[in-house]
Amino acid sequence: MVGGEATSAVEKLVSGVRQAADFAEQFRSYSESEKQWKARMEFILRHLPDYRDPPDGGGRLDQLLSLSMVWANHLFLGCSYNKDLLDKVMEMADGIEVEDLPQFTSRSELMKKHQS
């Protein structure tokens, strides 16, 4: 019955992934595009086991959601943040593939062009 056990294991895995995605869906912002949400959801799901709230609370999940927004805002909107914070979220997002990102010009880059 190895085939039956393998099928059961796959069904459990698929069910677990579906439950995790359904859980994460509640955190989607109404203003997020499908592309932004898929990237942020991957960020959340990747780190969810490390940021589950302990039974007495603690706000770990809120921290993860905030980090996911920092990453998404930097990536998709060009927002800038403290270097340590940005380094942390970029490290957390390592390996998440996002295509066709917008290109942003910083204020200092604009000033350099203007002064030339």
Curated annotation (Swiss-Prot):
Q: Which residues carry this modification: N-acetylmethionine?
A: M1
One of the Pfam families matching this protein, by short name: XTBD
Highest taxon above the source species: Eukaryota
Question: Which residue intervals define the domain XRN2-binding (XTBD) in the entry?
Answer: 24-116
Tell me which UniProt keywords the record has, alphabetically: Acetylation
Looking at the keywords, is Calcium present?
Answer: no
What's the family?
Belongs to the CARF family.
The record's subunit annotation is: Interacts with XRN2; the interaction is direct.
Q: What is this protein called?
A: CDKN2AIP N-terminal-like protein
